[in-house]
Amino acid sequence: MNDKEKEICPRLIDFLVVVGKRNRTRGASQSSPDATTDTTVTYPEILRRYPTDDHKDFILPTDVTVFCQPEGCTTTSARLRKNARNDPQFFVFMLTEKDSAKVRYGICLNFYQSFDRRSTPKDEIKKVPDDAHHKKRDSHVSLTSLCFISHHPFVSIFHQVLLLLKRIIDSSNHRAAQRTGLKDVVWAILTGHYNEPIVPEVMKEIKEIETWILMLLSSPVPVPGKTKVQIEVMPMDLSQVFEFALPDHTRFTLIDFPLHIPFEILGIDMALRVLTAAMLEFKIVIQSRNYNAVSMCILSIVALLYPLEYMFPVIPLLPAYMPSAEQLLLAPTPFLIGVPSSFFHHRKIRELPSDVILVDLDTNCLQVPDDLYIPDLPEPDATHLKERLKNAINKMTTMTVDNETSVTDADFGIDIDSVDVACRVAMVQFFNSANVFGNFSEHTRTLRLYPRPVVSLQTDSFLRSRPQCTQLITDLCRTQAVEYFAECCLCPKNETFVRVQAGIESAEQVGDKPKWFSESLMPVHFMVYPNNSTLDSAIRVYNAEIDNDDYEDDSATSTENSNSIDDLVFDENQVTDAGGEVTKPLAEVNYIYKEPMTLELPQSESVVSIDSSLSSGRSSPDSSLSTSAVDSEADFARLADNLALKSNSQGAFSFDHGSDSEYESTPVSQRRKTIHNPGSDASDTPTSRGSIKSGLRMKGLTTLTDSGEKVLGPSLMNAINGYAEKSQSVFSQVINKTAPKAQALKERTMKPLANRIEQSQHIVRSKTQPNPTSQQTANQQSKNQQTVKEFCDQALVGQSVGMFSAPKLKRLMEDESLRELVCSKLNLGLEVKLSEDEYVKEVQLTKGQFKAYVKILKACLEGIEVSFNTPGCCGFASVFHVLEIAHTHYWAMGGGEVITPSSSAPSTMTTPSEHSNDILKESRPKLPASTIDLRTPTKPLGQNVTPTSTNNHEIAQSTRSPALPPPVPPREAPPIPKRNPPPLGAPPKVPEGARAPPPLPPRPKVKTTAVDETPQNLVPNNQPAQPSSPSFLADADEQTKPLLKPAPPTTLPVGKQEPCKVLPTPNEPVRHYIYQELILAVQHQIWQNLQFWENAFVDLVAQEREIVGMDQEPSEMIDRYSALNDSEKKRLELEEDRLLSTLLHNMTAYMIMCGTGQKALQQKVRRLLGKAHIGLVCSKEINKLLDELPSTQGNFIPLKPLGSRLVQKQSFTVCPGQSSDGQMMFMEVCDDAVVLRSITGAATERWWYERLVNITYSPKTKILCLWRRHDDKVHMHKFHTKKCRELYQCMKAAMERAAARGKVNVEGRALGGEFPVHDTETNQGGLLQVRCDGVAVIFAHNQIFIGLSNIKKCNTFGGNVFLLEEFDRKKGEIIQRRYFSQMADQICYAVLCVFSLAAAGHKKEEHSK
């Protein structure tokens, strides 16, 4: 279910339905109550409904009748019901919409009601006739239902309201009978059993009842975490004020009934077995004679599964009288269904299906078919769970005994609610235990966010990481609930799971009942009881007489189910559609009903719209960028300073607050620490962000009081204004805790290598400190990184790893971060900038480099294999980087030797440019593009590197994130070796023991570029083209031209072909790729393990998304996506498709190179293609590639460059604040946003261009001011940077490009506007107009205009005062004007936009001149 389906319905109650037996004056088929049988059962019908019209978003289902009366409408003799209980029966059912899966709750009250309409003279009402007993014997009662249909599960309160409604109708019925002598006349009229003209006295009663009902249906719904609706239904002496409130996302969802019912009825052990069966998605049927017990048990089981969500049909009470109801038990999908005890008898079911588990609440019996097995819960987690549940239940039992003498009912209710919270907390703790879902997010990887999140659970690594891999967790991982849970962890709608995980367990902090949080909510009072109503007097009279009167002896009686269903007579042919017979309210009071259309918020000084769109903050570069052209830079900086620093004490809109700015500029990584502090204030939830108020925040650091849950005084409305932003960013911090992205990999890889390499003889460590501190861990990791760099540097100069160093290298390569470091150092193709349509270029190595590469990469593969087989490994995305090097790096046999830096004569090193003239003179046939050296010529290795550059490089490496090192900056590549071809006729020497390389197909035709036509870029190419398929042939003219750097092929060379054996000519060096020594020489079993490839793929996807920035605050990105237009949504989806398809393309190439079975390869890739929901454009390319796979193992499929290498970002060093004393950060200017990163590379903020309001800078102070709009609030951020002008120009250019592409939407952003103001000096009211040329203030008798060039300063004061300073050029003085307005902030913002537009226009004029 998506967010739209979860939107809050503004109606508290959708419908009130009266269900029972319709009176039919005609029709012989209707069973008569005067028949010989005393009891008959008919199909229930809707007798009356309020309102009579359906809602636009909800049509009342016709089958609601059988849900209200599951065993049919029973009509029986009052004589038989006389000795029965007089308590109406209450229960709950659910209506689920098929298309949208929306759930509505039915809260039903059933009772037997008489419709005897015999008239008695008024003067004989109190006389008892002689045949009274005979008449009572002949009267009949019929089952009648009062039912609320609502989107909201206020079960207990609705129960009380239904009882009150029945009491109101009974009271009016009693008063009408006294006045008219017509018995049960009100009930008869409301249920359609009265066919005579209605007397005025009775009509008055009907009108008051229907008015009360329609007023009740007009009640609004509370806004979660913001408001509470207080409904006054009767005077206080007759009924309490019913308070409705919904918890916010940091608390458990509302369960307004005793949640512990399954444990109380079945016992803890049996209830846990039923919970386990539901958890594993078995088919479960629960039966009982008590409707309420069975429906509550079903709902409780579903609620106790949190944080899992039951993904299949849930029917708390399946009616026995519903046609074909038994077919649901044959459904192929799992289900959780409650039925009355008569269901199987009535539906003539003799035997349950063999895959259905039956639970009988009446006998406490659990029937499990022989073919099914419910595994036991893992230990010791199950024992701990049972102990917590027993403690909670025993506490309730103890309090029950105590309450009999000393505790009030209200206190007892509090304890019951606390018991329910304790049960829910115990279940959450069980799910979070080590053997169940402990460290669950470390094994999830986000594949995509749009159009809906797709998250992959690495089941294999997850199971291997469990201390005890039980059958339960193995089966649980295969359920849809766990798959959905992985997606919910990315952007959870309810964060209680995370809070309990952090140690926040008390009912006051996570409880769902209003008594724990209602004090902080704004009340919305609603009056249902009209002032002129006489219903209260009728109730008082009825209450006084009910004890001494036998009025109810033959009217309302109990609904206890008949134990002998055989005695009932069923009329199953009476299924009719009574929709046309439902009439409007009898008293013509339809006008009373006012359907709530929007959520109700109390009036405040600031206008807030609950459904305000995030797109309201968008602006175009023309209207949001400004320079200092209008005024001096100092004045503009002061303007920005005033706009930012003026606090708002009234709770209305303000540009910024000092405390807010400081708190918002705090990196996410620092704010995230609150999640681990169980002693923090309740308001400082693990996911809270933004400012509540600085005082409250300071208290929350030391104490755990209720003050953190409340917002006091005038700051309350400010909290409501900022609530949407808090909720938005609340998710982002949960994401940093639970999101399946590479951040988890970073935290894992920062763990010390000590545990894994302590046995190594090559690392000297102190044995006296078995648990090193974090500082020691960081030092050890730094030493390991330095060691790995030395190995890589040696390999780059051609020195191989020694035999004594090899074990140490193998140990180090078991760490994923060090493998990533190796790949970033050894991959010489990283410095080649490629476009999206190019392919990764091949790189030539020297013989020494080749041998060193092979040895180091072998150690990497061995470490990857260890990681794959180690429970709880930190990922192995590096396998793709290793295979990329093996795929593209080669050594040309016979190509000569390059003098390494260790040579004694580095100054005499020969470069390829020395022989360029000789190469040009040769007229030999040229080799196709596959033999061209693709590296750009650089400075030879023999040249010395200055110490400064070396140190800088090492510093950059040390500050890089260990798990995800970004691509290294351009560095000097090894020289192109001098190639001395062997004598004519002499075949190239092949080392002994080396396997002959497979024949290479010719590369596609290449295009020439004028850039690379310099002689030093040319290399000898002497082999003629080999015969192959036409798509691989090069033109003859191309072969005779001087060889140039090739361009990528336009089509994929994946045609089915058997490569011809290429016989090397005497003049052509044979290429020997690394994969031939690394893969072909030793066959690793992991290449045939498809789960290994899938895990590596999702690891690399997570890594790529992290580098590109696709996973930074996913909730914000999803909300932004929903606010974009269709074309922008498609663009974002296509970006994710390209990233995924590129990785799938490369994985296919690697699997072919590693010899994975072709059929298995195709199945796995196609499965991932569907799992990732890749669009048609990109999936078509992958399918074409899979259809034309080469049949020979090798590197025939060219590689595509990763998306992270294509993204070209401009980064600037900034310091938050007005000086350089703050913490250094990096600001990246991207295509559609500005990303702020910490020095560790972690993204802390992302600001989309469409939400930027204004950008200014001051070259004098080196300060860049940036305003952004979020939920109708504007926040300003200041950054000190030496390159403020360059940063401003870069951001401006990026925003202009985004606007040209349509990314920044400017629709609906009208410049200027009119605002009502009140002059504080003259005490006049008027209109303030913000225009392009200035500000005009219009009063009743005069008008003031202030030109734009004369405005010196404008800001807000106190939140509701707009202050404007005008420079009077004639007098040479400044005039200050103050205007009171509730829209002061918007006036200031409008003036700021006009300044920005004027500044941009002025700059354009200067450029045109």
Swiss-Prot record:
GO terms for biological process: apoptotic process; chemical synaptic transmission; defecation; egg-laying behavior; lipid transport involved in lipid storage; mating; positive regulation of acetylcholine secretion, neurotransmission; positive regulation of anterior/posterior axon guidance. Residues 26-230 form the uDENN domain. One of its GO terms (cellular component) is cytosol. GO terms for molecular function: guanyl-nucleotide exchange factor activity. Residues 251-390 form the cDENN domain. Residues 392-496 form the dDENN domain. Keywords: Apoptosis, Cell membrane, Cytoplasm, Guanine-nucleotide releasing factor, Membrane. The keyword Disulfide bond does not apply. PANTHER family: MAP KINASE-ACTIVATING DEATH DOMAIN PROTEIN, MAP-KINASE ACTIVATING DEATH DOMAIN PROTEIN MADD /DENN/AEX-3 C.ELEGANS. Interacts with cab-1. Guanyl-nucleotide exchange factor that regulates small GTPases. Converts GDP-bound inactive form of rab-3 and cab-1 to the GTP-bound active forms. Regulator of presynaptic activity that interacts with rab-3 to regulate synaptic vesicle release. Is also a regulator of the cab-1 synaptic transmission pathway. Probably by converting rab-3 to its GTP-bound active form, plays a role in the recruitment of endophilin unc-57 to synaptic vesicles. This is MAP kinase-activating death domain protein. It comes from Caenorhabditis elegans.
